[in-house]
Amino acid sequence: KFVLSKIKSNYKYFNEDYDYLFNSYYVKAGPRYTRSLRNIISRPGIEEILEYRKTINQRIIELSQSSNSNLDMIEVGCHHEMQHQELMLTDLQHGLSFNPTSPKYDPTKKDIENENIKQEWISFEKAIKNVGTNDEYFSFDCERPSHEVLILPFKISNKLVTNGEWIEFINNKGYNKSEYWLSDGFSTCQQENWQSPLYWKKENSKWFHFTLNGSKEIDLNAPVSNISYFEADAFARWSNKRLPTEFEWEVASNNHIHGNFLENKIYQPYSKKNGA
């Protein structure tokens, strides 16, 4: 809507009340409905919302195909929409997790069988590297400008930390040993009584994880998920390792990355295949 109303001089509102209802925090877009009361808004209903979405999608497609389209603004809008999709899945998992019947978000989704990946360490030599970008293609402001940074020698694992490895951390009382934690992290850990990743539950000596595909017995080979930065940092210290820096990760991620996209309808991270 922001893109369309800026570019199209004859833009017609689907519903003028939507600006007020759906403005989460954009001050320049006008007044906003009280944040603490937004959860009680039950109208417009799902059919009207889907029709609104369909209308906006069609207008964006038409605009992108026109000769006077502003592709930069459209691309920013598309990236922002992808953030919304990620947040909606996160909220859906959190909301459904309170249902005692452990419902599935998508009953048609199949589970992925994760392989036990052999861990290898990929080495990077000391170097001065360019990070960020000055290119004309899309980028966020925080990714600019391109500049040089000194990268000291480091190694990074070829695979993600698995649930099985995380259970070892739990069994070693990792959540109760302050020496592994940053100060704020350990305070939060104690205050909120963290003893495992979010959505994990132990029943009859077995660990279960609530996912968008319902509650499942933990797949020991699957990458761990639903953890905080504090937990990740504590695990790294317990492992006598550390997390990569922002610049180390930017350099390392220039290698081929095995991706998992929303279209796959696999709403959990999964391990790459051996040899991939």
Give, region by region, the residue ranges found by the protein language model.
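Alpha-helical scaffold segments that form or flank carboxylate-/histidine-based iron centers
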Residues: 1, 16-20, 40-49, 69-83, ...
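Short alpha-helical functional segments enriched in proximate histidine and acidic residues
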Residues: 2-6, 63, 87-91, 169, ...
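Short capping motifs at secondary-structure boundaries
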Residues: 4-7, 154, 161, 169-177, ...
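Short, helix-capping/interhelical loops that line the mouth of catalytic, cofactor-
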Residues: 5-57, 97-113, 211
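Short glycine/proline-rich turn/loop motifs
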Residues: 33-43, 66-67, 144-150, 205-222
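Cytochrome P450 catalytic-domain "roof"
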Residues: 60-69
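Functional-site microenvironments in short loops/helix caps that host divalent-cation chemistry
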Residues: 77-83, 87, 91, 95-139, ...
